[in-house]
Amino acid sequence: MKNLILKEILNNELKRQQGYIELIASENYVSEQILEATGSVFTNKYCEGYPNRRYYGGCEYADQIEQLAIDKAKEIFNAKFANVQPHSGTQANVAAYLSVLKPNDKILAMGLNEGGHLSHGSKVNISGKTYEADHYGVDKETQCLDYDAILKQAQEVKPKLIVCGASNYSRVVDFKKFGEIAKSVGAYLLADVAHISGLIVAGYHPNPLPYADIVTTTTHKTLRGPRSGLILTNNEELIKKINSAVFPGSQGGPLMHVIAAKYLCFDEASKPEFKTYIKNVIDNIAILSQTLKELGYKIIADGSDNHLLSVDLYSSKQITGDLVEQWLEQAKIVVNKNLIPYDINSAKSPSGIRIGSAAMTTRGFTTKEFKQIGLWIHEIIESKGNPNTINKIRNEVDLLVKKFPIYQDIKY
C-alpha cells in the first residue's frame, strides 16, 4: 500500500477488528480467500447482462465465475433460480419490488420500529416513496408475530405484495403461515431472509422457498460472505421479470469481484463445518440471553431462536441504548443501539440494544465466552459507565481476544 493515509486507516481498522468483541448482528468475519477474491482482478471487468448474454466483449471468465455462483446458490438454498448480481440486500429488494409491482401499488411489511427494515416501505426509503406501504408489528405482550392480526390487516389493506422477514426479530418466522395469508388475499409473498439465510442453509430455520414467490438476502451476516445481495425463486413465471428488474431495471454492470467472493461464500456454506458453525451461533446467543435474563434484563420476545437478541434496557434498568453502546465500545465491546417494539424513546436514544453472536462465533467463542460477555455488559451497566470499571473490563477483553486471533497474516 503506497498511500500512507489509507495504509494507516486500513491498519487501524484491522487492529480494531482484531482487538474488539464484535456483537453487531449484521456483521461477521469473512475468510481470507473471500477477502482475496473481493480484491481480485475481476475488479477491472465490466460486463452488463448475464452469462453468455453480455453487452461487452472479454467476458469468458466472468461468465464462468457468475455461473459458478448461480449454481452454488441454487444448490445450497434448494432453489430453481438465483440472481447473484444485486449489490446489496436493499438492491435485491428494490429489484424484487420492480419485478412484480407498479408505482403506488400496496405492500404490507413489518414496521421499522418493530423489527423490519428501511427497504420494507419506510417513508424515508425509496420503497416507501414508490409504493403505498402499510406495516404490521408484533404482539404487545409476547413481542412475537401475531399471524391472525397480520391476516386481518392483509384482508383490510389488500396489498399486491406482502413482505416477511426482519432486521431485528429473534424468533422463527412461519413462512408457511405467511404463504397462506398472501394466497388468501391474492398477494405475492417476498421473504427477506438477510439475517437468517445462514441458518436456512444449515437447516436451523425453515426455508421460505416452498411458500414465497421471491426470496431476497444479503450475503454477509450469517452467510459469512462479502457485503452483497441475492435473489432466489422457485416461481418460473417470475424468472425473466426478476432478471430484467435487476438489469437493466435497477443496476448496470455487476461487481464481478464481489460475485467471485459470493461463489466462495456459497461454497463455504455448503460444507459440513458450516452447519456446526451455525449450531454454535445459536447456542452462543442462547447462553447470552439466559445470562442477561438471570441478571434482571428483559429480552425482547423472551429469547432467541436465531443469531440475535434485543435487550429492553429502559424497562430493565431505566437507561437508554445509546449510552450503553458508548460505554461498551469504550470497553472494546461493540453493539448497536436499537428501537424496541412500542418504544417510547427516540431512534437516537432508544430503549434497547441489539446483540448478535455470528462474528465472535467465527472467531471461536463458545458458550463460556458468551456467558462472560453477559457478565461484562451487566457490570458496565451497573457501574453506570464508571471509567475504572470500563478500563478493567477493557484489559480483560484484551487478554481474551488474543486467544482467538484473526487475520494474522494480513498487513497493509
From Swiss-Prot:
Q: Which GO terms describe its molecular function?
A: glycine hydroxymethyltransferase activity; pyridoxal phosphate binding
* EC nos: 2.1.2.1
Question: Any keyword Amino-acid biosynthesis?
Answer: yes
Q: Which chemical reaction does it catalyze?
A: (6R)-5,10-methylene-5,6,7,8-tetrahydrofolate + glycine + H2O = (6S)-5,6,7,8-tetrahydrofolate + L-serine
Identify the Gene3D superfamilies for this entry: Aspartate Aminotransferase, domain 1, Type I PLP-dependent aspartate aminotransferase-like (Major domain)
Superkingdom: Bacteria
Keyword Amino-acid biosynthesis (UniProt):
yes
Q: Which InterPro entries match?
A: PyrdxlP-dep_Trfase, PyrdxlP-dep_Trfase_major, PyrdxlP-dep_Trfase_small, Ser_HO-MeTrfase, Ser_HO-MeTrfase-like, Ser_HO-MeTrfase_PLP_BS, SHMT-like_dom
Q: Which GO CC terms are listed, alphabetically? A: cytosol
Say which enzyme class the record assigns: transferase
- Annotated site (Plays an important role in substrate specificity), which positions? 220
* Localization per record: Cytoplasm
Cross-referenced Pfam families: SHMT (PF00464)
Q: Which residues bind (6S)-5,6,7,8-tetrahydrofolate?
A: 112, 116-118, 237
The record's similarity note reads:
Belongs to the SHMT family.
Q: Which HAMAP family match?
A: SHMT
Function summary = Catalyzes the reversible interconversion of serine and glycine with tetrahydrofolate (THF) serving as the one-carbon carrier. This reaction serves as the major source of one-carbon groups required for the biosynthesis of purines, thymidylate, methionine, and other important biomolecules. Also exhibits THF-independent aldolase activity toward beta-hydroxyamino acids, producing glycine and aldehydes, via a retro-aldol mechanism.
Q: What is the protein name stated in its UniProt record?
A: Serine hydroxymethyltransferase
